[in-house]
Amino acid sequence: APPAMMQMWTMRDISDRYAPNSTDAPPYHVFDEMSTMGYSSNVAVSYDINFHRDLHISERVKHYTTIVKISDKKLTALGEGFFVTEHVEYLTGDEKPFADALITYFQYQAAEEKAEENTHRHSKQMEAGSPLLKGLSNAQTDYTDIEISALHVGDRLPKVVIPITHRLIVGGALATQDFTPVHHNAGIAQAAGMPDIFMNILTTSGLAARYVGDWAGANSRLEKLQFDLRAPNLPGDVMVMTGEVVALTLEPSADLVTVAFTGENSLGMHISGSATLALSGKK
């Protein structure tokens, strides 16, 4: 089971059912109560996840969630609302943890003028002459496992161009158990202050994990993933991912590499974060 997909295994399904024995009441009432107060729109804005081990076939998983922080009321380009951070523990049926996460959401009331403006706005595809696309080649990763002896701090990862299509946005949301309408219904997304449907954080997480994992090799293992989201990924755009080695650590059980990465589209920076991977040299 890919670590970046960890969160989806215990999410509510389309019938609003949780993984057995998971948190099924508070703290989710926080979001419900904010909705009744008029703050009904929600976007995820950051992840900070630690992956302790891989999941295996036949394991059953669950989660416990605790709200750890609610900000004062904030005014953003999307509207007015609150940043809510939850701490999630992911465990197997025998209570053994396999991951934990801090996830921050913005629960907000969309600015009326922003929603009206977005009903007449369409995303603009990045032009071929964009500085973001210059210097890119058609070369594909060879998926070869990288050894730490071949790496140096400052090494740059190859750029990767990812077309942002309706199929990727909608398919990614459904594949990750995220049935929130803003990811497949343009009218609802515009009412929430967005120009169009937009990519959910789980799809972005998967793309980021794929980017660093393909570079490090098939036998590498993602141990930590942290990032913030900014400009949305909208249909018709492209995202260019870049990365740089920022730390190398030799431990008795693993050789670790930390990569700082970004993903930029025509609106600006979509994702900025870092990932730590255990390379394949030690088992």
Where are these regions (language model features)?
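Generic structural signal for residues positioned in beta-strands
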Residues: 5-6, 48, 102, 171, ...
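Catalytic-pocket segment enriched in acidic/His residues
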Residues: 196, 203-248, 264
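Hot-dog-fold acyl-thioester-processing enzymes
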Residues: 1-46, 112-221
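HotDog/MaoC-like acyl-thioester-processing domains
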Residues: 44-158, 233-283
